[in-house]
Amino acid sequence: MHLAPHRCNELCQVAMVSVVHRNPKKVKSYFTSDVPNDYLFVTDKERLQQVLINFLTNAEKHTERGEIHLHCSLTENPGKITFSVADTGPGIPADQADCVFDRFSKLDEFKQGTGLGLNICSIIAGRLKGEVKLDKNYTGGARFLFILPLDSVPDK
């Protein structure tokens, strides 16, 4: 891991730019944040962006029209920084919600991918002393969360 101080909002904007150009014209992508622009926190930039890009890419794959929203928050989970990616796609069926982070888990066999992306996100989150979750209460599509504590040292 390559830990250094980074600006939260800049990391999110870079992740958005790397994915947004692939969005169909019927899908609006946007980023919002309640984090000050100058807010710094220590993380592994590449690993954090890998998780965000995976979440955004999955949202793009499964959203034919509507929107994809990346949000960064210091208030959703106090003492932690929360990144969320929400989309207006078909969502995750309740009977498959508990296995989305399992290796080789694919909810749609007709979509491109190996079923490893979310599992890798889970591993990265663990190494950063954080967690990834599916928001099972979200009803507008799918919403994935990447939650990092602000005071812990990631595993190497």
Predicted regions span which residues?
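Short helix-loop "hinge" at the ATP-lid/N-box region of the Bergerat-fold HATPase_c
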Residues: 59-60
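Short beta-strand/loop element within the Bergerat-fold HATPase_c
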Residues: 67-79
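Acidic ATP/Mg2+-coordinating residue in the GHKL
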Residues: 87
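Short conserved segment of the HATPase_c
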Residues: 92-104
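Glycine-rich ATP-binding loops of the HATPase_c
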Residues: 129-135
